[in-house]
Design a protein with these regions (language model features):
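Short, contiguous strand/loop micro-motifs
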Residues: 43, 71-72
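PLD/PLD-like phosphodiesterase catalytic module centered on the HKD motif
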Residues: 1, 54, 63-68, 75-193
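Active-site cores of enzymes that catalyze phosphoryl transfer or operate on phosphate-rich substrates
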Residues: 2-55
């Protein structure tokens, strides 16, 4: 994963100078001495920019009847993700969605209204809650899919908006696939509770 992060950040590093070039080439790093994990109950993947949207979309498309998806987001407005949620709910996937309720989170109200109206009309299981702590913002960017024998969780800097998911912003996201007996799975599920 360290190599993936290093390689993924090289393009961003190249554009950090005023003229878009670096005076010297970025160094190649030797990652061969970093041991691979022997834990087959825990896997990590690293995504940047639009690759995050593609992978999340594919995982939502792979959800099945009775599975549950928990979304905790600062912004939820990306049409592709909203459509994936609607299609998954139609297949019998349950959704728990927690959104930012501050003034900064205005797009969330429209997305939440659309999803709740859709759920009521078709009797689908989409539950939307707003995090409300006065002026405090809910700045989380997570999505978890509770499969029968493992958990998939995305966490990083990606808001679920067109700008963040369609290559207009530089974003980083980690995907964790973990068996339920792993500490990270318990920690993630405890966070949502």
């Amino acid at each position: 994963i360290i190599k993936e992060i290093y390689e993924g950040e090289k393009p961003a590093a190249k554009i950090t100078k005023k003229d878009g070039s670096l005076k010297q080439k970025l160094p190649d790093k030797d990652f061969s001495k970093i041991p691979f994990s022997k834990n087959d109950k825990l896997k990590l993947q690293y995504f940047t920019n639009g690759a995050t949207a593609k992978d999340i979309s594919q995982e939502l498309k792979n959800t099945q009847f009775g599975e549950k998806v928990i979304i905790a987001q600062f912004f939820l407005a990306d049409r592709g993700i909203i459509n994936d949620i609607r299609k998954a709910a139609k297949r019998g996937v349950k959704f728990e969605i927690i959104l930012n309720n501050s003034n900064a989170g205005l797009p969330n109200k429209a997305a939440a209204g659309e999803l709740m109206k859709y759920a009521r009309k078709h009797n689908y299981d989409i539950n939307v809650k707003f995090y409300n702590k006065g002026e405090e913002m809910y700045h989380v960017k997570m999505l978890s899919i509770l499969k029968s024998d493992y958990l998939i969780t995305y966490g990083g800097s990606t808001n679920f908006t067109r700008r963040n998911m369609r290559n207009f912003n530089l974003e980083n996201e980690l995907k964790i696939m973990s068996a339920y007996d792993q500490k990270i799975s318990k920690d993630i599920l405890d966070y949502y509770d």
